Swiss-Prot record:
It is an enzyme of class 1 (oxidoreductase). It comes from Prochlorococcus marinus (strain MIT 9301). GO terms for biological process: photosynthesis. InterPro entries: PSI_PsaA/B (IPR001280), PSI_PsaA/B_CS (IPR020586), PSI_PsaA/B_sf (IPR036408), PSI_PsaB (IPR006244). Phylloquinone binds at W679. This is Photosystem I P700 chlorophyll a apoprotein A2. The gene is psaB. The PsaA/B heterodimer binds the P700 divinyl chlorophyll special pair and subsequent electron acceptors. PSI consists of a core antenna complex that captures photons, and an electron transfer chain that converts photonic excitation into a charge separation. The cyanobacterial PSI reaction center is composed of one copy each of PsaA,B,C,D,E,F,I,J,K,L,M and X, and forms trimeric complexes. GO terms for cellular component: photosystem I; plasma membrane-derived thylakoid membrane. Its EC number is 1.97.1.12.
């Protein structure tokens, strides 16, 4: 007899109802809950999945390279990167009529194509790629890499090649390896590519497999390196008149500290980027030699954490903070969920910073003038950062349920955080209410006075503290004369004493959207506080969910119920929204709400600057109807007209996605609001009708159909809500921006 799904849980496989399928999918990746799972097997399985993950990434990159080389216009883009619209891939669709075929035949293509808003063309151009042949070669390499990593994943599951549990628990060696080899060496290797390939190409000199061993990346070769005359590598940088990709105005420097942007490509200087990578690679290689290796050389993490205490005789606190980090080393090293939570939080912060800096400090040549790509990449990275951050708190909560040992952590910082959770949660609650009432109150007040014809009665607050911070970095327009905006300050004198030319002040004081600090006023002040409200509310729900994971006054035995337990009904005073899973589920809605405010703000402010109409954001951004009318409605107009009775245009696929996204989003409410009993009755009715209908009654079920549990329905509803949100906003951002700028 064939084994029924899920094979990893034979108890669940015997379930005669459709619950079997749902619970099987839900626990497929929860290796801890699988039959016959040991701690060693768990680590080995997870280790192998990392190789699978790498294979998927390599395959995705290979697919992009292959389709752009095959169906794109990369070589035409290289000749004129500011005017040629990059093609992602061709479209073959049996639903296309002549109108849409004509509308989608664009960017010099002979048939219907999609325009690329991923920034891949700019990335590949910046790193020195110039021909379709190079893209094909890279695609083949990435495909081979995908096969190799898949093989590595399979190999490490074979008995002879399975690492032992002790190998996985050797935190210091793993840290050394990740710091020195993965981060350090890869950063230095990337410097090598930039210096040997990308920088020469940016100066009109091709370096390929045929000549890379004979072309010196710097006229002096390695002599300055060995004679410690490293400054030689910074001399003779590219001039301000350099034409990117040609020898005109090119210098010979490879590691510089120029600051600001290349005037023509409007991206960071490639020589600055190379300097950054060699510096960070060196730091990481040094860091990768700090922790205790198998020869007993280096620091012990356990000793470091346990030395972080207030028990030292000279410490003024004299142990008043408990025993600090005692027990933390074992707690982290023995909990995969703790480690994953830390990794997700770190990556989440980094991804959000990437979103900001791709706009404020663009590193790819000419990408700053591709407004649609910039808008899409900002939204994309902020959305990903949000998912990663919510995941960090989710696994933090699972840690408290599954892995936390109260005895091991007695009176240390973890225990202290749990012990003071009421204070933490109530303070966060107070902050969210303060932000919410005041921000909404000012928006609503402004709305009313504008509606009644008295816009001069709006409450408009200048963000003076933020303006001061900008001035301290060198923004002159506010007249603060602080630090770098004061030519006579110690900061300015120190900056001016650096040898050579530096351009960060030019970048900060630019008059366009590429200024590192855009001018800010009352509209920014209000939306900043709205975003702060979203951040604090999301954090409140997530932190409360994690800190209450083990127990509350209402449910002191919560840790015994697991991470996601169903509603108990009114028996214990009502426990419907009390599992940690429910907190993460509720936080997702606030996180998506917050993302809307963050991305709306960035997008509208930039649209206004790009269109030369800064006053639109500054004047309409101070009241709610301004946001609804002059941002959402005004920018949806072209989108809603993507197709109409008179024909279609190239925005019509985005218009359709906008409509479809709303449908998916609204479908979510069907699962989020309905009661479980209604679904069970509906299913029973449908099954009854099915069984009594000719032809339809030939199809039967092996499993008895049962309604989704409350937790399952919430998940399905949230999935629809989230995907609908992404489809709707993605289509809106791309269509509203490309409709204006191409």
């Amino acid at each position: 007899m064939a084994t029924k799904f899920p094979s990893f849980n034979q108890g669940l496989a015997q379930d005669p109802t459709t619950r079997r399928i749902w619970y099987g999918i839900a626990t497929a990746h929860d290796f801890e809950s699988h039959d016959g799972m040991t701690e060693e097997k768990l680590y080995q399985k997870l280790f192998s999945t990392h190789f699978g993950h790498l294979a998927i990434i390599a395959l995705w990159v290979a697919g992009n390279l292959f389709h752009i080389a095959w169906q794109g216009n990369f070589e035409q883009f290289v000749l004129d990167p500011t005017h040629v619209r990059p093609i992602a891939h061709a479209i073959w669709d049996p639903h296309f009529g002549s109108g849409i075929t004509e509308a989608m035949t664009q960017a010099g293509a002979s048939g219907p194509v999609n325009i690329a808003y991923s920034g891949l063309y700019h990335w590949w151009y910046t790193i020195g790629m110039r021909t379709n042949e190079q893209l094909f070669q890279a695609s083949i390499f990435m495909s081979i890499l995908a096969c190799w990593t898949l093989f590595a994943g399979w190999l490490h599951l074979q008995p002879k090649f399975r690492p032992s549990l002790a190998w996985f628990k050797n935190a210091e060696s793993r840290l050394n390896h990740h710091l020195a080899v993965l981060f350090g060496f890869s950063s230095i290797a990337w410097t090598g590519h930039l210096v040997h390939v990308a920088i020469p190409e940016s100066r009109g000199q091709h370096v390929g497999w045929d000549n890379w061993l004979t072309v010196l990346p710097h006229p002096a070769g390695l002599a300055p390196f060995f004679t410690l005359n490293w400054g030689a590598y910074a001399q003779n940088p590219d001039s301000l008149d350099q034409v990117f990709g040609t020898a005109e105005g090119a210098g010979t420097a490879i590691f510089t500290f120029l600051g600001g942007l290349h005037p023509q490509s409007e991206a960071l200087w490639l020589t600055d980027i190379a300097h950054h990578h060699i510096a960070i690679g060196t730091v990481f290689v040094i860091a990768g030699h700090m922790y205790r290796n198998t020869f007993g050389i280096g620091h012990s993490l356990k000793e470091i954490t346990e030395a972080h205490n207030t028990r030292h005789p000279n410490d003024p606190h004299k142990g008043s903070f408990g025993i600090n980090h005692d027990g933390i080393y074992e707690t982290v090293n023995n909990s995969l969920h703790f480690q994953l939570g830390l990794a997700l939080a770190s990556l989440g912060v980094a991804t959000s910073l990437v979103a900001q800096h791709m706009g404020a400090l663009p590193s790819y040549a000419f990408i700053a003038r591709d407004y649609t790509t910039q808008s899409a990449l900002y939204s994309h990275h902020q959305y990903i950062a949000m998912f990663l951050m919510v995941g960090a708190f989710a696994h933090g909560a699972i840690f408290f349920v599954r892995d936390y040992d109260p005895e091991l952590n007695k009176d240390n910082v973890l225990a202290r955080v749990l012990g003071t959770k009421e204070a933490l949660i109530s303070h966060l609650s107070w902050v969210t209410m303060l932000l919410g009432f005041h921000t909404l109150g000012i928006y609503v007040h402004n709305d009313v006075v504008v509606a009644f014809g008295n816009p001069e009665k709006q409450i408009l607050i200048e963000p003076v503290f933020a303006q001061f911070v900008q001035a301290a970095q060198g923004k002159m327009m506010y007249g603060f004369n602080a630090l770098l905006s004061d030519p006579t300050s110690s900061a300015s004198l120190a900056a001016n004493s650096l040898p050579g030319n530096h351009y960060w002040m030019d970048l900060i004081n630019r008059q366009d959207a590429l200024s590192a600090f855009l001018p800010i006023g009352p509209a920014d002040f209000l939306v900043h506080h709205a975003i702060a409200l979203g951040l604090h509310t999301t954090a409140l729900i997530l932190i409360k969910g994690a800190l209450d994971a083990r127990g509350t006054k209402l449910i002191p035995d919560k840790k015994d119920l697991g991470y996601a337990f169903p509603c108990d009904g009114p028996g214990r005073g009502g426990t419907c929204d009390s599992s940690s899973w429910d907190a993460m589920y509720l936080a997702m809605f606030w996180a998506l709400n917050l993302l809307a405010w963050v991305t709306f703000y960035w997008h509208w402010k930039h649209l206004a600057i790009w269109q030369g109409n800064v006053a639109q954001f500054n004047e309409s951004g101070t009241y709610l109807m301004g946001w609804f009318r002059d941002y959402l409605w005004l920018n949806s107009a072209q989108l809603i007209n993507g197709y109409n009775p008179f024909g279609v245009n190239s925005l019509s696929p985005w218009a359709w996605m906008f409509l479809f996204g709303h449908l998916v989003w609204a479908t979510g409410f069907m699962f989020l609001i309905s009661w479980r009993g209604y679904w069970q009755e509906l299913i029973e009715t449908l099954v009854w009708a099915h069984q009594r209908t000719p032809i339809a009654n030939l199809v039967g079920w092996r499993d008895k159909p049962v309604a989704l549990s409350i937790v399952q329905a919430r998940l399905v509803g949230l999935a629809h809500f989230t995907i609908g949100n992404i489809l709707t906003f993605g289509a809106f951002v791309i269509a509203s921006t490309s409709g204006k700028f191409g």
